[in-house]
Every structure is written in C-alpha cells, then in structure tokens.
C-alpha cells in the first residue's frame, strides 16, 4: 500500500514529506526532485516569493546512492524566509512582550472570502487566522511534488509511463488546439510563459493576467493532465473506493483552490447523445487487437484504464487573496471590514498544472502497485511482464479465430 503525508507550515522552518510503500530499486536523486520543484515555480503571474524561495531540499531517508531502499522516503524542503519568522512561528513558547513588538505577529482577524481562514478559525477555535493560513497555503504543494517525483520515476521505469500537463484556459481565454500534446511537447509547454500548448493564445492569456493585476484582481483557469503508456486493467469496477476515476478526482480536488474535475470529455458528454459520446471499438492488428475511434472517456471506463491515454482536467478558482480586498467581518470587533491581503500570485494556474501531474502520479503509482505488487522494481517488473504476456496471448488467440 502506497501512502504519503506532508507536514509543515508556509513560514515554518521547513516542509516535510514522507512516502511509504515504494518498492526498492527506483532510481531517483536530489537533482531529480529539485528539477520538478523548479517546474512548480513556472508560469506568468507569479508572486515575488517564487523568485527567492530556493526550495533547498534534502532526502533524509529511504534512498541510498540514488535508489529507493524499500523503506519510507522522507524529504525535507527548507523555507527560505524562516529566519524572518523564527519567533512568530516558533514551536516553543516565546516571550509575549517580544511577540507584541513584532509587526509580523499582528493578529489576522479579517478573514478572506473563499479562503480557509474563517472556516478554519471556527473549526479549531482560533482567534485569528495565522494558524489556518500557514497550513492551508499552497506552499504545501512543494512537499507533494517532492514525493510525487518518486512516484513519477517509478511509473516511468516500470511501464514507460509519461505524465504531462498544460493550461487549457486562463481567466476567460482558452488555448486553441485540436489535439493532445505528447511527451515530446513537454519542454515547449514548460518554456511557454503560461504553460499553454502552442502559442496561439499565449499573448491573450498574458494580457488577461496583466489586466487582472492592474485591477487588483486574480484569475482562475483549467489545467489538463495526460498520462501516456498505461496498460488496460489499472483500477477496478468492483468497489467504489477502487475506481480509478474516483481516486483521481479526489486527489485533484485536494489541491488548494481546485473546485472541479473532469475525466476525458465528461462535461461535454453530458450534453451529447450516447451515440456521439462513447468511444467505438474496432478490430486491430497486434497485441492490443482493438482500437478506439476516439478517446472521449479519457482512457477510463468503469473505473479501469482501457489502454488509451489517461486525460483529466481540473478547474482552479481565482486566488482568494486579492489586492482589491473583498468585504468581510473583523472577528474581534464584529464590524464590517476589508479582507486582509497576503502576498500572493495573480494566478497560480500554470503552477497548479505541475502539482496536478504530481497527484496523478501518486494515484497511478498506488493503483499500479495494487495491481502488480512486489517489494522491488525488478519483482514488480516481472509481474507486469507476466500480465502483459497474458494480454498478448489472448489477443493472438482472438486474431487466429
């Protein structure tokens, strides 16, 4: 069973992530994780924090000489600004007079609409929102990306799976493409200022961001994640919690500010007749023995992969920390107030796409291990080869008939 957890606050000393259940023998290095953390910083409309957050990381367990050892993989990512926050965010008690003298420790009593601020204060009985926003911050996703890199390398080394993402809409601007990007397109996407596939809509997306910044506003958007190389049979139709589409949706919805998930052309299919919604099946030569005329299902049927590329989309709402503050209530005085503004991005949609890749990788790695088992990469690979050999054998028998 693959499990993972993160800990740490946005302005604490560090973030920590632990991945348990990964097989031994997966090749991964500090440099591999650092490269993915750099990708997480990509995108037009970033906050100044992205420019100075160094993401200094250390693998503190589970990897030796560039290979996983079968034990929990633990990663620590230092927060660059910790020295400025050492007293405000200290784990041990600090002299109240010292805290009172610190501007950074001013109570945050004007919760932001759309943020976890108020609901978290009500749930945990806090008098201000600092304890909520520190953990609710999307800074936490850096820890997810760290352990997700291990999952991504496992999938690539076991099955040749490649996962990529791109921005399909930003604010009111949609990217213009009539086909999916492939693994060879990833570098071009990462080099694009808004991580769009193709340049047709890039300038309009950037203009949308600039306009929002000028107005003191923020933007949301939609990202798409595609996984190539998955064999049929990952996931299950048998139980609700084993359905791969359900697990993917839950994982993507766990990303900060994600408010909707679509598998394949799910929402468009809701407006079509069945004859125009489903992917017809045709005979084909070779080990797959069938082919699809389309991939509107996004590679999943009945909660199981069907051999087509896996395609999922996630909708991200606009960031809730706006320079043009929204109306709120001061929780101390009970009087109307303007919501506080923390330093934030104008849009985090391009970065959210990279985080979405991470969540897809973690879910797929767990499902693949459930399907094939094993304690080491070579053992799991043998199990995969046996399964694929069985698929080929059945395909050959059908073709002989």
From Swiss-Prot:
InterPro entries cross-referenced by the UniProt entry: Chorismate_synth, Chorismate_synth_AroC_sf, Chorismate_synthase_CS
Pfam family, one: Chorismate_synt
Binding-site positions, FMN: 135-137, 256-257, 302, 317-321, 343
Pathway: Metabolic intermediate biosynthesis; chorismate biosynthesis; chorismate from D-erythrose 4-phosphate and phosphoenolpyruvate: step 7/7
Catalytic activity: 5-O-(1-carboxyvinyl)-3-phosphoshikimate = chorismate + phosphate
Entry annotated with the keyword 4Fe-4S: no
Residues noted as binding NADP(+) in the record, renumbered to the chain: 40, 46
SUPFAM superfamilies: Chorismate synthase, AroC
Leader sequence segment: none
GO CC term (a single one): cytosol
Cofactor: binding comment: Reduced FMN (FMNH(2)).
Protein function: This reaction introduces a second double bond into the aromatic ring system.
Record's subunit section: Homotetramer.
Family: Belongs to the chorismate synthase family.
Name of the molecule in the record: Chorismate synthase
Annotated organism of origin: Saccharopolyspora erythraea (strain ATCC 11635 / DSM 40517 / JCM 4748 / NBRC 13426 / NCIMB 8594 / NRRL 2338)
């Amino acid at each position: 069973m693959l499990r993972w957890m993160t800990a740490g606050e946005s302005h604490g000393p560090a973030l920590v992530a632990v991945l348990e259940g990964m097989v031994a023998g997966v090749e991964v290095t500090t440099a591999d994780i650092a490269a993915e953390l750099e990708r997480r910083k990509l995108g037009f409309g970033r906050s100044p924090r992205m420019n100075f957050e160094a993401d200094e990381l250390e693998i503190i367990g589970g990897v030796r000489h560039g290979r996983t050892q079968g034990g929990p993989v633990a990663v620590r990512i230092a927060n660059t600004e910790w020295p400025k926050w050492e007293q405000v965010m200290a784990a041990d008690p600090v002299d109240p007079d010292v805290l009172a003298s610190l501007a950074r420790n001013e109570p945050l009593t004007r919760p932001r609409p759309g943020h976890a601020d108020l609901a978290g204060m009500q749930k945990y009985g806090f008098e201000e929102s600092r304890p909520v926003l520190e953990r609710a911050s999307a800074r936490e996703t850096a820890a997810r990306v760290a352990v997700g890199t291990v999952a991504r390398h496992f999938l690539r080394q076991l099955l040749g799976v490649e996962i990529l993402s791109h921005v399909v809409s930003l604010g009111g601007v949609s990217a213009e493409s009539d086909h999916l990007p492939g693994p060879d397109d990833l570098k071009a996407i990462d080099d694009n200022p808004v991580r769009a596939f193709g340049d047709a809509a890039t300038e309009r997306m950037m203009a949308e961001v600039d306009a929002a910044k000028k107005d003191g506003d923020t933007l949301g958007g939609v990202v798409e994640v595609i996984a190539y190389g998955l064999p049929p049979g990952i996931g299950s139709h048998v139980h609700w919690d084993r359905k791969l589409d359900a697990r993917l949706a839950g994982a993507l919805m766990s990303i900060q500010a994600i408010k909707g998930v679509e598998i394949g052309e799910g929402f468009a299919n809701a407006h079509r007749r069945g004859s125009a919604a489903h992917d017809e099946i045709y005979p084909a030569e070779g080990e797959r023995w069938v082919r699809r005329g389309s991939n509107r299902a996004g590679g999943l049927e009945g909660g199981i992969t069907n051999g087509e590329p896996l395609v999922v989309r996630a909708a991200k709402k606009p960031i809730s920390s706006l320079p043009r503050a929204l109306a709120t209530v001061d929780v101390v005085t009970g009087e109307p107030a303007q919501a506080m503004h923390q330093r934030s991005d104008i849009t985090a949609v391009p970065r959210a796409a990279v985080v979405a890749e991470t969540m897809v990788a973690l879910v797929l790695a767990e499902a693949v291990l459930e399907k094939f088992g094993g304690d080491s990469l070579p053992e799991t690979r043998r199990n995969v080869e046996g399964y694929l050999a069985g698929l080929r054998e059945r395909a050959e028998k059908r073709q002989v008939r």
